[in-house]
Structure formats: C-alpha cells, structure tokens
Amino acid sequence: MSRATLVIMAAGIGSRFGGGIKQLAPIGPNGEIIMDYSVYDAIEAGFDKVVFVIRKDLEKDFKEVIGNRIAQKVEVAYAYQEVSDIPAEYAEKFVGRTKPWGTGQAILCCKDVVSEPFLVINADDYYGKSAFKEAYSYLTSIPSADKIQVCMVGFVLKNTLSENGGVTRGICRVDENGMLQEIIETHNIEKDGDKAVVREGDIETEYDADSPVSMNMWGLTPEFFAILKNGFEQFLNKTDMEDLKAEYLLPTIIGELLKEGTVSVKVLKSEDQWFGVTYKEDRETVVEAVKSLIDKRNLSGQAVRLNRVHIKNRTFEKRKKELLKCQRNKNRPEIPDEKIKLRENMRRDPEKMVSENSV
C-alpha cells in the first residue's frame, strides 16, 4: 500500500478564547476531541502516519492528552513551530515578534519528518470522511507532470458557515476540468437563511452558497518544501520589521504559484458538512452535529478514545466476575483486600462503580 501522512497544524492551541484550549475541548459522547475524529477518519481512509505541528512548550501536555494515545494506533511524529525559527540573518530584524508566522511556516517545519505525500489540516476543524478518502486516493496516485501537483479539498460554502457570526472563506474559481484557477479571500460572510451574504454598512453582497471554498485541507508532496523555504526567505526579506502581524499563509503562497504557472491544483469535491470552532458558541453546534452524524452512522462515536475505554471496561468486568466467584466459593479461606474493598463499593453504589471504571 502506498504511504501518505496526515499533518495536523496544532501550534495555535490555547491562543484564542482567553487561553481556553479549544482543540482539546470534548465534543464527542465519550470525551472525544475534534482531532480524534480527524485521525480516525484518516486512518480509515488509508493514512498510516500522523505528524502534529505544535509549540515546544505544549509538548508534554499535548502528548499526555492526545499524542501518546494516538501513537498506540498509528505512527506519530512531531514538528515544532516557533516564532524564533527563522534564518539567522533575520533574527535581529524581527526580535519583537510574538505572533506565529502562519501556515506556510507550519508546514515548512515538517520537512525533516515527512518524506511522502501528505495532507495538511487544521487541528480544530472537522472535515468529514469523504474528504480524507478523496485526498488519500489522489495522494497515492499522483500523475507525473511538468508542474508540481497539489490537491485541495473544496467544500460547499453553505456547509461551512457559522450560526454565530461572520467568517472568512477562500472562495475558489475552478475550471471545467476541476482545476483551481484562483482563491478569493472573502471576509465576514454570514449565514442568512439559505443565503451567504457580506454586509458592509447598507450594502449587502450575496455569494453563491454552493461555491467551492478552501478550508485549509491541502495535499502536497515533499518537493513542496523547497518552494516553501525559498518563499519564506523572500517573505521575510520584503516584510517590514514593524509589521509584527504579517503571516506566510499557504493559500496566498499557492495563489502566487498558480499565477506563476509553477503548480497545478486539483480541486477534490466534498459535500460533507464542515464543522469548526470559530466562536466559543460554535462548540455546542459542533457537539450536536457530531451526535447527529453518529445517529446517522456517518461518524464513529467511538473514534480512537473509546478503544481505551473498552479495555478498561473489560478489565472491570473481569474483576467483578472474580469477586462474585469468590463470594460463591465458601471453601476459600479469605478474599483479597482489594476485592473486599471493591465488593463494599459495589454494594454502596454499583452504578457509580461502573461509571467510574468506564472513563
């Protein structure tokens, strides 16, 4: 089987919503987080390696909360995105910089741990099963060509809007062959019934709600790292030292490469509903959406986390059977202290005991 890697950009954990780690907030019935579902769907599609792009200071907590658990199911590697990780000649120029450099640098950080075609996603977005299947199929059968081959999973605009406010989306212009021609970054798109609109004062502009949009789900090959490296140095060179918010962003990079004729970008269509946490209030929407998908059997409510829960449940049931056997065996001289304690706890509140040993 051909190899393909999933790269999850998670260096921004904790930087929004007053320090709340939104990516790690449970959204599934068994405590799953959004990344659980992304990894689960990716493994089902065929991806056999996951690379987490994180900050070094988050490594310990990240591994404890999700990384070590995922590593039991699939090969895991880490790449570290730091503001200071720039060529030495630019260090003094941007000495006051605290804002991350953007998705382009995040991917560039993976160059030493990725040597196969890879799919890039955001840590706090849910993309749906079909998106991973389409991407894996493309990445494991990339045709040879003069230009660098890239793919992008395009989502339907109306399937990506928030009920809680305006969002920024990259609206895509695609030709009749499904090739990307242009990405138009559009701000403050609001959901208005079945419409997608942008309001500026008294002026309201309506957009085709069925337009394909980019949600930062890109399929790339290792040769893209050289392009990113050269482009990042050019970006740093032309960025003013006082511009502490400028970012090296993948959609912008690919847009420029399209104009130069350096790359070809195949747009893979997905009709799946996209879910993400743009606003704090979006979390409840995501929780309900996940529950609905599970009820429709389009999503595993178990994901990766539940495998661990099942193991604990089996261990508990085995201990309970042993205790009951001991109680029936009157010839046994004594019951171990651990089992006596378990028996007393079960007698007081057996349902609580089952619950406590199931998470």
Question: Model regions: which residues?
Answer:
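Glycine-rich N-terminal loop/short-helix segment of MobA-like nucleotidyltransferase
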Residues: 2-29, 45
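A C-terminal functional module that forms or caps the active site or interfaces directly
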Residues: 229-262
